[in-house]
Amino acid sequence: MGSYSAGFPGSLDWFDFPGLGNGSYLNDQPLLDIGSVPPPLDPYPQQNLASADADFSDSVLKYISQVLMEEDMEDKPCMFHDALSLQAAEKSLYEALGEKYPVDDSDQPLTTTTSLAQLVSSPGGSSYASSTTTTSSDSQWSFDCLENNRPSSWLQTPIPSNFIFQSTSTRASSGNAVFGSSFSGDLVSNMFNDTDLALQFKKGMEEASKFLPKSSQLVIDNSVPNRLTGKKSHWREEEHLTEERSKKQSAIYVDETDELTDMFDNILIFGEAKEQPVCILNESFPKEPAKASTFSKSPKGEKPEASGNSYTKETPDLRTMLVSCAQAVSINDRRTADELLSRIRQHSSSYGDGTERLAHYFANSLEARLAGIGTQVYTALSSKKTSTSDMLKAYQTYISVCPFKKIAIIFANHSIMRLASSANAKTIHIIDFGISDGFQWPSLIHRLAWRRGSSCKLRITGIELPQRGFRPAEGVIETGRRLAKYCQKFNIPFEYNAIAQKWESIKLEDLKLKEGEFVAVNSLFRFRNLLDETVAVHSPRDTVLKLIRKIKPDVFIPGILSGSYNAPFFVTRFREVLFHYSSLFDMCDTNLTREDPMRVMFEKEFYGREIMNVVACEGTERVERPESYKQWQARAMRAGFRQIPLEKELVQKLKLMVESGYKPKEFDVDQDCHWLLQGWKGRIVYGSSIWVPL
């Protein structure tokens, strides 16, 4: 889409395992020595125990609410990552200078220091300056920023944001035919002229439309047909125009702040009005989870079960047609590919069932690959001006029906708190590769506020890729400002270090490590965007792992997307990514209605963009490169890390949480090779594990 999540006080307090240190673990397998990881010295009181699901949602909803209430949120950059932004900026700059873009660029970053007084102000107007030292309740706040000192711009020929894919039964033999027969060659060659001035003019027109008087002519029908009717190209244009019109404001301007406040109050009051949340340990669950091993060994490519939302109708096997089309595209058989795309278009829609939506986005990607414009389309999708508030709402919908990210965050935060408590840490330094909007950390901040004894200082080093424009670190700095405000509410001493540059170019001194602090390195599903040895002589993945090994962290917790669609061969990769996203679209179709606008936005901004990159891009432009959890396990061991076995009680409680809050027959939680695995209907999607340096 990057980059959403939710969580808090005592959100993990119920993970109190008196038998943790007895050394008995799962499946009678030989285990690693974990003598260096003692049980918690500071068990949390029973009266603070609460349901992890409710507290996690409460904290993150509060954090998202705080983000949405900011006055200029609509104009702020979206932090859901665009892995090609830096590369596109560098290429355009080198081309403007008449030089060749180097494969391995290692520019030195610029280091600047910004006082938190410029970023965080109290309601009364006072600020917390980095040079001020106060009491423990108003401890020193500091803010550092490390960003890439390099101007940025668009690709010289970007695809317009309103670009519409079309497939017709009759196509010209030239590559431009992919846009439809009505496009001439000159028009296609000059269609990428949407300048900043034009964008500002469009924005001004949209703002002016807010003040137009209401009339029947302005009323539109938001319903979208589920089936194709009439000519495909006309239907697609009407669908796009309807979508664009529906985004315009009503004639009478209404401040969204009140609406958002009411929406979040209804959610938060429900959580706070309850007298005492029932501890998950006291709730009644089955003695054993549904299955001992929930991940089936079904053959690759087996179709997911039909979802409850699907309706009966005779349609061709879209997956088979997509694979056949991919084979035709791979050998440049344009005639066959065009015919198959035309047939697929007749039975696909972004508003249909899971299979139809899947086919819609894969057809777009195959069409872009056939035209040779995959990178431009992906860049345009990544650069689309979608407001952060809309993205957050879509993400909130996702985490409300899918436990993947919630479970990964609970697992990581609980592990950090347990080990930090065992070490009696006074300062916790979290180095987060891919911090995005920082949704993972409010729950941990809330936990720190409930911690016994003296207050613990929190340091966070937020690492992100640079954004386009003259302020490449603006997004990651904004994340630090929000986290600082959250720490201020709970009187947690806080220090933030922002880094916006290529991850493989980060040096040890950039992280500003200090003696005696508890260092935890974390990454939530973002290592998949690092290039590997197939496209770079020095693998950025191994380089980042070696950097983490040099840090000598007290704990390293990678959360990975476990996938096998990183093969260099197109058809093989296409099959794997098709099976992977078949599960994800089926999951959305089972848990959300087709008309849900947030579902449509999430699938378009995240799934659709990722599919476009995997299918239509190659070389360094293909940044969606997941590996299986066993491949990441081998990489970590080669880099000098030792894996820590999972807590049996923790895995059991997470299973029960998913089974009680979600559909137990579809969402899977299990473990293998000391990895906590999550999946859908037997297919592994995400994995998390704990490592320490040798």
Curated annotation (Swiss-Prot):
Listed GO biological process terms: regulation of DNA-templated transcription
Sequence segments annotated as region (Disordered): 289-313
GO-annotated cellular components: nucleus
Motif VHIID: where in chain: 428-432
Cited Pfam families: GRAS
Domain of life, per lineage: Eukaryota
Positions of the UniProt region annotated as VHIID: 395-462
Record keywords, A-Z: Nucleus, Transcription, Transcription regulation
Region (Leucine repeat II (LRII)) location: 478-510
Region of interest: PFYRE: 519-613
Region: SAW, residue numbers: 616-692
Domain GRAS, first and last residues per copy: 309-692
GO terms of molecular function: DNA-binding transcription factor activity
Region listing for Leucine repeat I (LRI), in residue ranges: 316-376
Subunit comment: Interacts with SNRNP35.
The protein's role, per its UniProt record: Probable transcription factor involved in plant development.
Family: Belongs to the GRAS family.
Protein name stated in the entry: Scarecrow-like protein 33
Lineage per the UniProt record: Eukaryota, Viridiplantae, Streptophyta, Embryophyta, Tracheophyta
